A protein has these predicted regions:
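Substrate-binding pocket helix/loop in short-chain dehydrogenase/reductase
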Residues: 92-95, 99-104, 196, 200
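Conserved Rossmann-fold SDR core element
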Residues: 157, 166-182, 228-235
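Catalytic loop of short-chain dehydrogenase/reductase
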Residues: 87, 97-100, 104-107, 111, ...
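C-terminal substrate-recognition "lid" of short-chain dehydrogenase/reductases
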Residues: 208-235, 240
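Catalytic Tyr-x(3-8)-Lys segment
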Residues: 193-214
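Conserved glycine-rich cofactor-binding loop
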Residues: 14-16
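Rossmann-fold cofactor-recognition segment
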Residues: 49-66
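Conserved glycine-rich Rossmann-like NAD(P)H-binding loop of the short-chain dehydrogenase/reductase
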Residues: 28-44
Length: 242
């Protein structure tokens, strides 16, 4: 996918899919910058990943534009930007119970965050560079309690298509994960996380739910494939067929 001459910035790189992507890029020889809000979590991620000569961590909240602008001043030149960050805590609720502040935080992290990354990061990308974001199955298979996340994912995919045109020849794509066993599921299902994932695994044609590495592999593919832009790559075990 990449080599030691390529520089990859991963927003959300301290856990879950972003951490798996950081590991994948490091294994491929890239120089990696992981970004997150929590400095302690970033430090733990760096310990897990190793590779101190090719890995650095920068703290920033991508839902705040001034922090994104500062982030890219510190990051320097890049080849690829990827974003797996999402703050959906409290955003899964029936409408009468929905905390609108939580809904706004979710929109800020998954729509405005990518918009800020593109606005301030595109100029830092080398020719042939790419931006890759993560939407999700909720845009295609919404469920009760999931209205906010369904709308956010659909909005992000619209943004990806528009940015692919506006920022060309830079490439802009999205990966749409299905149900993936990552820490974010604690915010979705709470104590029922394991039960919910096992139930979904029985429904899916693939016979299992996703792993963080499945999404990392898909993002790595989009980084490498120079003839793919404005595309949503579905990595969901056949969920849209189930």
């Amino acid at each position: 996918m990449t080599d030691s001459r390529q520089k990859v910035l991963i927003a959300g790189g301290s856990s879950g899919m972003g951490l798996a992507l950081a590991r994948r890029c490091l294994d491929d020889g890239a120089q990696v910058t992981i970004v997150g809000r929590d400095e302690e979590r970033l430090a733990r991620a760096c310990e897990q990943l190793g590779r101190p000569g090719r890995l650095r961590a920068l703290a920033a909240d991508i839902s705040r534009e001034e922090q994104v602008a500062s982030l890219f001043e510190r990051a320097g030149a890049l080849d690829h930007i990827a974003c797996t960050a999402a703050d959906i805590q409290g955003a899964y609720a029936l409408l009468p119970d929905l905390d609108m502040a939580a809904a706004q935080r979710a929109v800020a992290s998954k729509v405005f965050g990518p918009l800020y990354l593109a606005r301030h990061g595109a100029a830092r990308l080398a020719p042939g560079g790419s931006l890759t974001f993560t939407s999700g199955i909720a845009a295609y298979r919404p469920q009760p309690r999931g209205a906010v996340v369904a709308a956010i994912n659909a909005a992000l995919e619209g943004l990806v298509r528009a940015l692919a045109v506006e920022l060309a020849p830079l490439r802009v794509n999205a990966v749409s994960p299905g149900w993936v066993d990552t820490p974010i599921w604690t915010h979705v299902a709470g104590d029922r996380k394991d039960e919910a994932l096992q139930s979904m695994a029985r429904r899916l044609p693939a016979g299992r739910v996703g792993r963080a590495g499945d999404i990392a592999d898909a993002i790595a593919f989009l980084m490498a494939n120079t003839f793919t832009t404005g595309t949503v790559l579905h990595v969901e075990g056949g969920h849209r067929l189930a």
